[in-house]
Amino acid sequence: MEWKIYKEEFDKKAEVKLEWLDSEFNKIKSGRPNPKILDHVMVEAYGDKSKLFEIANMQVVEGKQIVVKPYDKTLLHDINSAIQKENLGLSVQVDADSLRIIFPSPTEETRKASVKKVKEFSEQVKVEIRNIRKDVHHKIKDDKELREDELKWYEEDLDKLTREWNAKVDKAFAEKEKELMTI
């Protein structure tokens, strides 16, 4: 098989892992409001569950708040209940036609705990990338069509590809760590 096929398989699987990492990072509060922290909030609306961003507009205001304006004002209390159920440690104020979600300033201790959690997620993804590398490496070794020199070249490219994906994980970690530790 051609290297391109192995690379595409590796890239596709590694991209899924990086997307998962990004979604986990978005769930971690940094002290600055980010509407992505609410992406996974499911609201009971119209007899079905809907994602919050599908039924409301969200906007960061005053540097420490997110204002949630539902398209249908009758959903205010359902949205409030869904946010409270997520147990995100946020204060929610219900106004006449919107919700104000207030982000408390994190303490040094909570910032360090968040960085530790982010580091654990990053390490988990690196292990998963190594496992992807291992799977692809076995497929390369089992490929009877490859000559010895091609096998060595493929292995070198596989190692390079693994380093590139690990560098992406490291970059994502460094950015999130900086965001968390910035007061």
Curated annotation (Swiss-Prot):
GO biological process, one term: translational termination
Superkingdom, natural source: Bacteria
InterPro entries reported for this sequence: Ribosome_recyc_fac (IPR002661), Ribosome_recyc_fac_dom (IPR023584), RRF_sf (IPR036191)
Signal peptide (UniProt feature, chain positions): none
UniProt subcellular location: Cytoplasm
Cystines in this chain: none
Coiled-coil ranges from the UniProt annotation: none
Pfam families tied to this protein: RRF
Keyword line: Cytoplasm, Protein biosynthesis
Family: Belongs to the RRF family.
HAMAP family in UniProt: RRF (MF_00040)
Record's function text: Responsible for the release of ribosomes from messenger RNA at the termination of protein biosynthesis. May increase the efficiency of translation by recycling ribosomes from one round of translation to another.
PANTHER family listed in its UniProt record: MITOCHONDRIAL RIBOSOME RECYCLING FACTOR PSEUDO 1, RIBOSOME RECYCLING FACTOR
Protein name: Ribosome-recycling factor
Species annotation: Malacoplasma penetrans (strain HF-2) (Mycoplasma penetrans)
